[in-house]
């Protein structure tokens, strides 16, 4: 496939361009420059309205995410027959669909993280400062707590009786199983985030930034399909924390550490893989 070319139709304009595919596309000069790494500390952000606006966007997005998804979980749990509700597939669609919609809405304001693990992975890749990363994580957790709290306010009895959407390792699985599921699931999500938002790809293909929320939401959907039977699917420490705090019963905290340690390990591995193996950033800096 090296060096082969194909005609590409560009939207409704019907213009054609000669675009190489295969390895030839990788070697073509696209006037791309590697963005500089974010500083570790950036005190100037604290005096910028855009900094606080981004945090508010993360709060609202995570609030809405917990509100819709926990309501969906409660609707499935309360049913006596699987055929009368959306089931596991519906829960997975609710989580994936909300991430798709919310990332689309907030990407231009905050980057659309909605997840401390995503924020942590991007911080390790030097995509944002420690100041911003910590602020995002706090706002995400507060939004998740408020979102779960509103659900409990709407249907307290049902919420209390059905576990409040809290993440726990299911019977028949060990804590190691749960931890492994969270690590791999978060790796898939964060690696998808890196790939979908890659600046080099965006420079090459102008449609990529618009479509970025789609693969991210789809990754969330697929991971939920696979791991709901194991842990209820965390892959988002804010989601797990919000549900656990509002439900606040003993078993909700028994395995809670898994839903922080697993996602953070998965995010770190995804950042390492993307930056070192896929993008080869350390090797570029030496050349």
Curated annotation (Swiss-Prot):
Its localization reads: Cell membrane
List all membrane-crossing ranges.
56-76, 90-110, 134-154, 176-196, 210-230, 258-278
Question: What is the protein's major site of localization?
Answer: membrane
Instruction: Tell me the domain of life.
Output: Eukaryota
Query: Residue ranges for motif NPA 2?
Result: 236-238
Topology feature Extracellular, residues: 77-89, 155-175, 231-257
- Specify the protein's topology with respect to the membrane: Multi-pass membrane protein
Q: Which InterPro entries match?
A: Aquaporin-like (IPR023271), Aquaporin_transptr (IPR034294), MIP (IPR000425), MIP_CS (IPR022357)
Motif NPA 1: positions = 115-117
Per UniProt, which keywords does this protein have? Cell membrane, Membrane, Stress response, Transmembrane, Transmembrane helix, Transport
Q: Does the keyword Acyltransferase apply?
A: no
A Gene Ontology annotation in the biological process aspect, one of them, is: response to water deprivation
Q: Does the keyword Ribosomal protein apply?
A: no
Use case = Can be used to improve resistance to abiotic stresses such as cold, drought and salt.
* NCBIfam families linked: MIP
Protein function: Water channel required to facilitate the transport of water across cell membrane; mercury-insensitive. Contributes to the tolerance to multiple abiotic stresses including salt (NaCl), cold and water deprivation, by modulating cytosolic K(+)/Na(+) ratio, maintaining osmotic balance, and reducing membrane injury (e.g. oxidative injury).
This one is known as: Aquaporin PIP1-2
Provenance organism: Musa acuminata subsp. malaccensis (Wild banana)
Q: Which gene name does the record give?
A: PIP1-2
């Amino acid at each position: 496939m090296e060096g082969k070319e194909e005609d590409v139709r560009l939207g409704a304009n019907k213009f054609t361009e000669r675009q190489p595919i295969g390895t030839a596309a990788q070697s073509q000069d696209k006037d791309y420059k590697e963005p500089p790494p974010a500083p570790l500390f950036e005190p100037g952000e604290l005096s910028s309205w855009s900094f606080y606006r981004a945090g508010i966007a993360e709060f609202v997005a995570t609030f809405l995410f917990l509100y819709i998804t926990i309501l969906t979980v409660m609707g499935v749990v309360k049913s006596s027959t699987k055929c009368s509700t959306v089931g596991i597939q519906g829960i997975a669609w609710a989580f994936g669909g909300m991430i798709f919609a919310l990332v689309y809405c907030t990407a231009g304001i905050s980057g659309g993280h909605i997840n401390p693990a995503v924020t942590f992975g991007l911080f390790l890749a030097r995509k944002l400062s420690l100041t911003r990363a910590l602020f995002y994580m706090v706002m995400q957790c507060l939004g998740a707590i408020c979102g779960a709290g509103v659900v409990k306010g709407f249907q307290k009895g049902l919420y209390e009786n059905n576990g409040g959407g809290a993440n726990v390792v299911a019977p028949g699985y060990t804590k190691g199983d749960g931890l492994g599921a969270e690590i791999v699931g978060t790796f898939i999500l964060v690696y998808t985030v890196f790939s979908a938002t890659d600046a080099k790809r965006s420079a090459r293909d102008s449609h990529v930034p618009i479509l970025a929320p789609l693969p991210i939401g789809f990754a969330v959907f697929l991971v939920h399909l696979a791991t709901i039977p194991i842990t209820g699917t965390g892959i988002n420490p804010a989601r797990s924390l919000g549900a656990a705090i509002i439900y606040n019963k003993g078993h909700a905290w028994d395995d809670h550490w898994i839903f922080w340690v697993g996602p953070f390990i998965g995010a770190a591995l995804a950042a390492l893989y993307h930056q070192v193996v896929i993008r080869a950033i350390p090797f570029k800096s030496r050349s």
